[in-house]
Amino acid sequence: MSARDRLIVGLDLPTLAEAEKIVSALGEEVLFYKIGYQLAFAGGLDFARDLAASGKQVFLDMKLLDIDNTVAKGVENIVKMGVSMLTLHAYPKAMKSAVEAARGSNLCLLAVTVLTSMDEQDVMDAGYNYDPQSLVLRRAEQAHAAGMGGIVCSAAEAAAVRKIIGGDMALVTPGIRPAGAEKGDQKRVMTPADALAAGSSHLVVGRPIVAAPDPLAASRAILAEMESALSG
């Protein structure tokens, strides 16, 4: 895969108009976009369909979690949207039902392990007797066993996760920040080059591109860093 196949621009924006403006500005430079809750509930689901129909790849970041049948029925309808990736929380029964519902389609199901905004204290406060990396690795094992298409985790855990899941599953890493960029609300971050070196297959970059004075120039700089890392 080239850098352009691996870069996912996060459209974490409040309005459809802002998202459309970013996609227009990035043009053919960016092939892959992430749509999460914020945009999804502001017309983003129809926008996801339109992007997919136009030839772009779409990562629908819905982090599904519900009873088995509800998850399965939701996945069946999401398959019809033509998007490329969908997230679920890494709970075994939900993952297994989703895998069955997506069987035979091109939808890559991604297991969310531990949010990159969480540190060790956050994990403990949530009631887990694990440090973040141990919880990530446990959930990665469960996702692999369930037949999921990939894992979402921070680049800090990417190398350890890759050892567990092998080379075939996607490893999608949010919390990517170019050198010198502010972390924002992310606590476990890494540069694009370091994330690729750690085993990430896809990098999600939001604010460093969409909030940049020149989003196209920002995307090109990140793609150049990724290409350099991939060729090195």
Curated annotation (Swiss-Prot):
The keyword Oxidoreductase appears for this protein: no
GO cellular component annotations of the record: cytosol
Pfam families in the cross-refs: OMPdecase
Similarity comment text for this entry: Belongs to the OMP decarboxylase family. Type 1 subfamily.
Residues annotated as the enzyme's active site: K63 (proton donor)
EC code(s) of this entry: 4.1.1.23
GO molecular function, one term: orotidine-5'-phosphate decarboxylase activity
Organism: Sinorhizobium medicae (strain WSM419)
Binding site for substrate: 12, 34, 61-70, 116, 177, 186, 206-207
Name under which the protein is recorded: Orotidine 5'-phosphate decarboxylase
Pathway assignment: Pyrimidine metabolism; UMP biosynthesis via de novo pathway; UMP from orotate: step 2/2
Subunit structure: Homodimer.
Signal peptide: none
Reaction equations catalysed: orotidine 5'-phosphate + H(+) = UMP + CO2
GO BP terms in the entry: 'de novo' pyrimidine nucleobase biosynthetic process; 'de novo' UMP biosynthetic process
Keyword set, alphabetical order: Decarboxylase, Lyase, Pyrimidine biosynthesis
Role, per record: Catalyzes the decarboxylation of orotidine 5'-monophosphate (OMP) to uridine 5'-monophosphate (UMP).
TM stretches of this protein: none
